[in-house]
Curated annotation (Swiss-Prot):
The conserved TPR domains are dispensable for ciliary targeting. The N-terminal half is important for cilary localization and/or binding to the axoneme. The gene is CFAP70. Belongs to the CFAP70 family. Its main location: other. InterPro entries: CFAP70, TPR-like_helical_dom_sf, TPR_rpt. Expressed in testis. This is Cilia- and flagella-associated protein 70. Keywords: Cell projection, Cilium, Cytoplasm, Cytoskeleton, Disease variant, Flagellum, Repeat, TPR repeat. PROSITE patterns: TPR, TPR_REGION. TPR repeats lie at residues 635-668, 669-702, 704-736, 929-962, 963-996, 1000-1033, 1035-1066, 1068-1100. Residues 410-428 have a biased composition (Basic and acidic residues). It is linked to Spermatogenic failure 41: An autosomal recessive infertility disorder characterized by oligozoospermia, severe asthenozoospermia and flagellar abnormalities such as short, absent, coiled, and irregular-caliber flagella. Some sperm show tapered heads and acrosomal abnormalities. Axoneme-binding protein that plays a role in the regulation of ciliary motility and cilium length.
Length: 1121
């Protein structure tokens, strides 16, 4: 890295002109300018007479030497401005030996641009009047009272590497609120101080001090925005205290990073900031961090996490007569009191892109052991570093090895009001002053409180004292990827799919040509037929029998062959058939075997015959036969059928339904996501990844596609891609709770605790904001809500907080496989349940269900049959292998339960175990009814019914009236073969006022149990409810069976016909149709239904035997008789 030359460089400050000036003795006073920097006078200008217009050309240049190795450093330039004081020289009176001067005003020049790489800059700075100055009343001219200033250095003070690698730290101390009652504004003066240490040059720590806070009584809130002030003493003009363009703007408590940003804290903070006593500083101190200090700062934050910010007060004692007007505390009299500390969590500064944290932080008594345990800090800034920090403006770094004589601390203080802000900034190379503690003994000096007990500091806790602090960096310590970069990376990994172009000369054209040739040939054959048999046809008309027609057919065929027309017709079709082979079947190469050739020819023949019939029907429609209405199944119905097939473990049929949806609408990304979720369920991760990537290629801004691509990338251990997908999702939708949570889980896998905490914190923040907004919306719609309930809800909305212990536990106990993780969760739950049972009894609670806040249940069809489309939208892609429950978000939820809902909805069961571990350890989560339901569902998927039953018992203890619990218990008993218990659970579920989240299979399975137990009336009612909610082949089949057993044959046939229309590949439907037709005596239909049943291979032997028995009874129905 480039090094700054050791020789000092000159910084020149030139005041060229002043505007709108006037004096005490008139509008054309004689004035001069004094330049000061770092409490050193740089020089005085010549005495210039102000023009009648108020301007004065000073052309005054002063300078100081910048030398980072000793003297004025980058840190000095960062937080110390140049003061330009304009003084009027009054005319000499008689017998007056010296000229009398009066100060008119003071201007402040900020040198910060020199640390940003500029070698010169020009600015117009306002001239702030002192009290009583004539400048308080401006002239009538439009120009403001100001000075024109130029700052120049021969070359940039910092190298390119220092500018790019360094940083600027700004610390703003606003106030301490709700201070102890023992703080009173009357009596001896007190210096209220706050301090912290930061690395400034390499590993050396430098203290930042804020002194002389103003104790104020309560009564009104501090105004915002209000200006930030320089941490410099003895500023003459009140307006010069304010840092240009720097303001305290405040903001909502919920957006702060501190400890008092929860909804339940708002009432206390409102009282503290309006009514109670407070100490006001409003100071901003700036510190330049060189590149090595930036690295040290990052490392210190990562290692310590919490930063100690100390607060104390020291009495100000008036110096005896002869030094009137000065208040200063001598070393002998110095005594720290009310020594407290606030622990500031600096970790958010290591979050990508974060440059600022602001918040309120509790003040605790300063105890060495506690401070060291929390922050790893061994020294107290006020007690161990020494009293020179209280008075001196120039102090050496704590770890500095350089030594120079300390500069005298006797500062000019004209009035007590001007003692407000003593600069506490260090200078490299200065010596450490002795500490209060004796250098030769570990025994505290007299008056120093014991290190293990701090009764005065305890008053901060009793009063609820907190400080409001802001820490800001010029550049983020950890850069954040820009959204454009993330979008580019996603585009590189998954190129967007271009829209399909229509080909005019492809398969469609080949089909059209074939149809045209068929029509032409058919007309030619008809012409030949009428030529040969026209008179005979006209004579016989409709009396022609089949033998005559067969004879005419043979004669026509013979004539076509003999005349060569048959050969001509074949040649005419040949070109069209070749185009179909090439464009439709994409066959352009020879076949590898004779068997393959024969198979293809057979397939082609069937296709050509079908298309010939299509063409002939278009040319010669059958006027006698009426048009048959085609039954079209919608995409939503296909999704329901696929769900039923999944639950019944007929994965081949489910895949067929999903693929049919894709064939119909290949550009619909939801269809790709549903098929990908199905592949996740069957653990075909490669196929699932392909589906999700295809969905993302259709819309690269689709959040769910990005998240699912990220989940699959994690499962397939493509971690770099996973980070890109998750980050892009959070950039596209910063309010998405699931996106932030999944990003945090990814960082956990990468052992990046800080970023994990960042993502979880942001997820919790977004969830809290959403729930608060929902509460506001509810209040507006329903009126005033109960105060007690509102308080309970607010207290449960605290942000997710991670502890080191919980993070470690999860990392240790989350192996790669879901099965291993679930076994560990089982053990953990057993231990936690034992502890819980020791402390309290199980509580039976009634789960409140608020539709204004809860999401709609996923698989519940609540509309009538005509509104199938709306009803089907409720399904989304939320099927599980077994009829799982998809829980709506209750009023109080966690970021992890939200993520579990998403993962279960898309069937990413392999990923759920990671989130369950966090939900168990989350302060707002833990073993809840909903948690046990999800855990039971995962065990049902593994067919571990004993564990699932155990967790369902736990869920029932926590919420006995939850319909989801009883519904899942019913499924558990049904799958394990205990149909009597399943029946009881299902009946209890449907008896609740509120439906379970998934009712479709509850009705189906309950109806099946009724059929088994020959309770046909109950089965009929149950299946009718299912048909009304979500009609499918299975619901109509169940209704048809129930009606058949009740001898209601007409209703049975109608229901079975509906079932057949929705799925004509169900052998059981054909079987019952055959039974109905046998009963009503329709032989042809009975034989046809029986034929299809045999073709589809009915597996129910008892039903097959029943059909054979009935066939023998009626004497027909089996073509083999």
């Amino acid at each position: 890295m480039e090094q700054v030359p050791s020789a000092g460089r000159l910084v020149q400050i030139t005041v060229t002109e002043g505007y709108d000036l006037k004096g005490f003795k008139g509008d054309t006073p004689v004035t001069f300018i004094r330049a000061e920097f770092n409490q050193v006078v740089l020089g005085d200008s010549a005495k210039i007479t102000v023009s009648p217009e108020g301007s004065a050309k000073y052309n005054f240049t002063s300078s100081f030497e910048f030398n980072p190795e000793g003297g004025i450093t980058s840190d000095d330039l960062a937080h110390k401005p140049v003061f330009l004081t304009v003084t009027e020289v009054l005319p000499k009176e008689k017998k007056q030996k010296e000229e009398k001067t009066l100060i008119l005003g003071q201007a402040v020049v900020d040198l910060l641009p020199l640390l940003e790489g500029q070698s010169s800059f020009q600015t117009t700075v306002p001239l702030h009047p002192v009290q009583g100055s004539p400048l308080e009343t401006p002239r009538s001219s439009a120009k403001q009272c100001s000075l024109e200033v130029k700052v120049l250095v021969a070359e940039p003070l910092l190298t390119t590497a220092q500018i790019s690698g360094g940083n600027l730290l700004k610390v703003t101390l606003e106030a301490a609120y709700s201070v102890p009652e023992s703080f009173i504004p009357t009596g001896p003066g007190q210096n209220y101080m706050v301090g912290l240490q930061v690395p400034s040059l390499g590993e050396k720590d430098y203290p930042i001090l804020f002194k002389n806070g103003t104790l104020k009584l309560g009564g009104e809130r501090e105004p915002v925005p209000r200006p930030k002030k320089w941490p410099i003493a003895n500023i003459l003009a009140p307006g010069a205290n304010n840092i240009p363009d720097a303001f305290i703007v405040g903001g909502p408590y919920e957006e702060e990073e501190g400890e008092l940003n929860h909804p339940e804290d708002s009432e206390f903070r409102n009282q503290a900031e309006c009514i109670k006593k407070r100490i006001i500083w409003d100071l901003e101190s700036r510190c330049y961090l060189d590149p090595s200090a930036v690295v040290s700062f990052q490392k210190r934050i990562a290692d310590c996490r919490l930063w100690p910010v100390e607060i104390t007060r020291v009495p100000l004692v008036t110096i005896p007569k002869g030094k009137a007007g000065k208040t200063e505390k001598t070393d002998e009299e110095a005594q720290l009191s009310f020594h407290g500390v606030a622990y500031v969590n600096m970790v958010p500064l290591l979050y990508p892109g974060v440059k600022r944290i602001r918040g309120a932080f509790h003040v605790y008594p300063y105890l060495d052991s506690v401070v060291h345990e929390k922050t790893k800090c061994l020294l107290s800034l006020f007690r161990d570093i020494g009293h020179h920090l209280i008075h001196n403006n120039k102090i050496g770094g704590i770890n500095s090895l350089l030594s120079k004589q300390a500069v005298s601390k006797n500062l000019k203080e004209d009035k007590p009001v001007k003692e407000k802000d003593i600069d506490g900034r260090p200078r490299p190379g200065d010596v450490q002053a002795p500490s209060i503690k004796s250098q030769s003994s570990d025994t505290p000096l007299e008056g120093e409180p014991p290190l293990s007990h701090n009764p005065e500091g305890q008053q901060y806790v009793e009063a609820g004292t907190y400080i409001v602090l802001e820490i800001q960096l010029d550049k983020a310590l950890v850069p954040k990827r820009m959204p454009e970069e993330l979008a580019r990376r996603v585009k590189e990994m998954i190129p967007p799919r271009p829209p399909l172009t229509r080909r005019t000369g492809g398969a469609q054209k080949a089909m059209s040509d074939y149809h045209i040739q068929i029509k032409n040939i058919s007309r030619a054959i008809l012409d030949e037929y009428y030529r040969m048999f026209g008179k005979q046809v006209a004579k016989l008309e409709s009396d022609m029998d089949s033998e005559t027609l067969e004879e005419q057919k043979c004669q026509l065929s013979y004539e076509l062959n003999c005349s060569g027309k048959y050969f001509a017709f074949k040649e005419q079709l040949k070109h069209a058939v070749v185009k179909i082979v090439r464009d439709k079947y994409l066959k352009t190469t020879s076949f590898e075997s004779q068997e393959e050739l024969q198979t293809f020819i057979s397939e082609l023949y069937v296709f050509l015959v079908d298309q010939m019939h299509v063409a002939l029907n278009q040319t010669m429609p059958d006027d006698v036969q009426g048009t048959v209405a085609t039954i079209y199944t919608s995409s939503e119905q296909l999704q329901l059928f696929a769900f039923e097939a999944e639950v019944n473990e007929n994965f081949e049929m489910a895949a067929a339904y999903y693929k049919e949806r894709l064939v119909r609408e290949p550009q619909n990304l939801d269809h790709w996501l549903d098929y990908g979720a199905f592949c996740l369920l069957t653990e075909d991760n490669i196929k699932a990844q392909e589906c999700f990537q295809k969905a993302l290629s259709l819309n690269q801004s689709h959040i769910h596609s990005l998240l699912l691509c990220g989940v699959l990338a994690v499962l397939l251990e493509n971690y770099e891609q996973a980070e890109i997908f998750f980050e892009d999702a959070t950039c596209l939708e910063p309010t998405n709770v699931v996106a932030w949570t999944l990003l945090g889980l990814y960082y956990e896998i990468q052992n990046n605790d800080i970023r994990m905490e960042m993502a979880f914190h942001e997820a919790s923040k977004q969830l809290q904001a959403r729930m608060l907004q929902a509460q506001v919306t509810k209040q507006k719609s329903t009126g005033v809500e109960d105060t007690e309930e509102r308080g309970k809800r607010e207290s449960s909305l605290g942000p997710w907080g991670i502890t080191n212990g919980s993070a470690t536990a999860i990392k240790v106990e989350a192996p790669a496989g879901p099965g291993a993780a679930l076994s560990i969760l089982d053990k953990f739950l057993e231990e936690s349940s034992k502890l819980q049972s020791d402390s309290q009894e199980p509580i039976l609670t009634t789960q409140t269900w608020d539709p204004s806040i809860s999401q709609k249940p996923s698989n519940t069809f609540i509309k009538e049959i005509p509104t199938k489309k709306e009803a089907s939208k409720c399904q989304d892609s939320s099927a599980l292998l077994h009829p799982g429950l998809h829980y709506g978000v209750s009023q109080t939820t966690t970021i992890f339960m939200e993520t579990i809902h998403f993962l279960m909805k898309v069937k990413a069961v392999q990923y759920v175990h990671r989130v369950l571990a966090h939900e168990l350890l989350c302060p707002q989560g833990g073993p809840s009814c909903e948690y046990y339901l999800v855990l039971a569902q995962t065990h049902i998927l593994k067919k571990n019914f004993a564990k699932a039953e155990e967790y369902l018992q736990q869920a029932a203890q926590m919420d006995y009236l939850n319909p989801n619990v009883w519904g899942l218990k019913g499924h558990l008993y049904f799958l394990s073969g205990n149909h009597s218990e399943a029946k009881a659970c299902y009946e209890r579920t449907i008896s609740f006022v509120v439906d379970a989240s998934e009712m479709h299979f509850i009705f189906l399975r309950l109806g099946l149990i009724y059929l088994e137990e020959k309770e046909y009336e109950k089965a009929k009612k149950t299946y009718m409810q299912a048909c009304k909610r979500s009609p499918s082949c299975l619901t109509w089949l169940g209704l048809g069976i129930a009606c058949y057993r009740l001898e209601e044959l007409t209703e049975a046939e109608d229901a079975l016909s509906e079932a057949n229309a929705l799925n004509n590949y169900n052998a059981e439907v054909w079987a019952y149709l055959a039974l109905v037709c046998l009963k009503v005596g329709r032989q042809l239909e009975a034989e046809q239904a029986y034929k299809y049943m045999i073709k589809l291979k009915l597996k129910d032997e008892a039903l097959l035997a029943e059909i054979h028995t009935l066939q023998e009874t009626v004497g027909f129905g089996n073509p083999s008789f």
